[in-house]
């Protein structure tokens, strides 16, 4: 009787411990939505750089993606452990000790989940509650005329085609990077640091070693070109096709996540600003290209509404190499998504990302990657109008 009572108490304590862990998991899962903005701001201004130092430093020791290694090796281990678990569970059922065994396994699994959620909150989740880059820059939404919108579009077009003239081409006339992946990763990191200091943006100054993903070709089926892993503070980059129109932006975007920015549109705004401030033609090209292609449909529609004549940019001679780059990029993605399976995987990847963003308070889901077009106009009017390079 005494042994049975002790056993019941032991099981009771295990159940209580499990319930406590479940409670903490729920609470920490709500952090990105509930933590006061002032707390998030204090954390990122004063603590994030120190808290992220250890995992970032560990990740920087490796040139290969730790995230990819864990996904591949972890997937294999999960299959093996699942088989072991089922065999042991059957044995325990026969010996009538299955209940305690299941509770023990559940306890360890919940401990791992809790640790991962805490790491997620510290390295990314809290960042959803801090100020936006737009606010840090002190920008204000203005009411702009068609001519002012066109002025910004012209500025981005001129910057784009000017930078494109200085980029090397392959035999098809398609632009390509002149640097190795590692050299690009180092340059992008220093570029984000430089621009964040210039505009007094509170980002971590830590070195972030971006990682190429070996299985990039298969990863492309999801339509994802970059991913930040908050557990390792690791920027993972798809290298199956080094798209000259977007590769520098992708690098800068993922590095921005690792340096403390959580929102997707913040990372895109910061990345585009960093790229146009670069002295390197490849980065300038990608930054101006991103802004031009974002503004183009908006300004064109504005012209139609106002009855204005909209410039036919795509007929300009300087636009020809840009069009070749665009067509090469489209051809790659058309080939990747040419099968039913790849399109299905793409839809799954997009919906998973959509749910992830919404669960972290980003109501627009994947639409939050889009930077509102007027933010580029606000930035130009505030910082660049009248400048020598504007």
Describe the function of each predicted region:
Residues 63, 246-268, 272-273:
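Active-site recognition of the HExxH zinc-binding catalytic motif
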Residues 324-390:
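Pan-zinc metallopeptidase signature
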């Amino acid at each position: 009787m005494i042994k049975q009572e002790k056993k019941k108490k032991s099981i009771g304590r295990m159940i209580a411990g499990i319930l406590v862990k479940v409670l903490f998991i729920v609470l920490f899962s709500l952090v990105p939505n509930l933590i006061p903005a002032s707390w998030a701001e204090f954390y990122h201004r004063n603590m994030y750089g120190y808290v992220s130092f250890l995992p970032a430093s560990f990740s920087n020791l490796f040139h290969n993606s730790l995230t990819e290694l864990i996904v591949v090796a972890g997937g294999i281990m999960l299959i093996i452990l699942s088989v072991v678990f089922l065999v042991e569970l059957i044995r325990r059922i026969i010996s009538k000790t299955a209940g305690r065994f299941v509770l023990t396994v559940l306890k360890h699994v919940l401990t791992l989940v809790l640790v991962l959620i805490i790491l997620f909150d510290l390295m990314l989740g809290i960042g959803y509650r801090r100020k936006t880059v737009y606010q840090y820059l002190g920008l204000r939404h203005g009411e702009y005329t068609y001519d002012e919108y066109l002025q910004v579009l012209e500025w981005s077009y001129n910057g784009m085609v000017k930078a494109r003239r200085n980029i090397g081409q392959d035999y098809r006339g398609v632009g390509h990077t002149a640097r190795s992946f590692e050299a690009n990763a180092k340059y992008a990191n220093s570029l984000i640091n430089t621009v964040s200091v210039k505009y007094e943006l509170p980002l971590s100054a830590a070195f972030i070693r971006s990682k190429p993903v070996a299985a990039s070709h298969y990863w492309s089926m999801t339509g994802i070109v970059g991913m930040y892993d908050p557990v390792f503070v690791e920027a993972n980059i798809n290298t199956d096709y080094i798209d000259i129109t977007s590769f520098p932006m992708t690098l800068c975007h993922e590095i921005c996540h690792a340096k403390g920015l959580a929102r997707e549109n913040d990372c895109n705004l910061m990345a585009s600003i960093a790229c146009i401030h670069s002295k390197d033609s490849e980065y300038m090209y990608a930054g101006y290209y991103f802004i031009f292609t974002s503004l183009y449909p908006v300004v064109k529609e504005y012209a139609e509404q106002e009855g204005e004549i909209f410039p036919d940019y795509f007929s300009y001679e300087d636009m020809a190499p840009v069009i070749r780059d665009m067509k090469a990029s489209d051809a790659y993605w058309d080939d990747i998504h040419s099968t039913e399976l790849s399109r299905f995987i793409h839809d799954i990847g997009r919906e998973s990302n959509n749910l992830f963003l919404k669960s972290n308070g980003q109501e627009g889901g994947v639409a939050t990657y889009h930077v509102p077009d007027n933010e580029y106009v606000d930035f130009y009017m505030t910082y660049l109008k009248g400048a020598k390079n504007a």
